[in-house]
Amino acid sequence: MQRFYFDTSVFGGAFDNEFEEATLQLFERVKLGKVICVFSDLSETELLNAPENVIKHFKNLPKENSERVLVTDEILTLATKYVTENVVGKTSFDDCVHIATATIYKVDILVSWNFKHIVNVYRIRGYNSINIRSNYQSLEIRSPKEIL
C-alpha cells in the first residue's frame, strides 16, 4: 500500500473552500485503506493551534491506515542543509523538517497545499538535489489535486 506523508496544510485543506474537494477525496482514500497517511510529531504540534474542526478531523484518522513518525536528529540535520543551501529561508525551517521527514521515512509521496515553500518545482529540485548528494532518494512532492 502506498504511504503518503501529509503535511499540516492537508488537514486544514478539508475546511478550505478552494482545497476541500480534493482534500476530502484524499482522506476518503485513507479511510478506504488505499493509502496510509503518514504524519509526524511536528504535524501534531502544529495542529495544536488549529481550529477545533481541523483537530477533530485529524483525530478521526483511522488508526489502521495512519502512521505516526518521529522527527529525529538525522531529519533535523537534513532540514538544516535545505536552509543552509538556500532552498528556502530560515523562516521555513518547519517546512524543511516535513520534507526531510518524508525523505528519511521513504514515503511514496509528500502531499501538501503549501505552494510557496513545498509544492514548487524550483524548491522540489533544490530539495532533491540535496537529498541525492546526501545519499537519500529523491522525494515525490504533490498537491492532493495532482494525485487523485
PLM feature segments, named:
Residues 38, 69, 140-142:
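General small-molecule cofactor/ligand-binding pocket signal
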Residues 68-126, 148:
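Active-site neighborhoods of divalent-metal-dependent phosphate/nucleic-acid chemistry enzymes
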Residues 44-46, 95:
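Acidic-residue sensor for enzyme active/binding pockets
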Residues 1-39, 46-60, 66, 84, ...:
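Short, well-structured N-terminal submotif of metal-dependent ribonuclease cores
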Residues 30, 61-62, 102, 134:
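A generic structural signal for well-ordered alpha-helical segments
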Residues 1-3, 9, 17-20, 44, ...:
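Acidic, PIN/NYN-like endoribonuclease modules and their adjacent C-terminal/linker elements
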Residues 64-65, 137:
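Short, structured coil segments at secondary-structure junctions
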Residues 41, 72, 145:
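Residues at the C-termini of beta-strands that transition into short coil/loop
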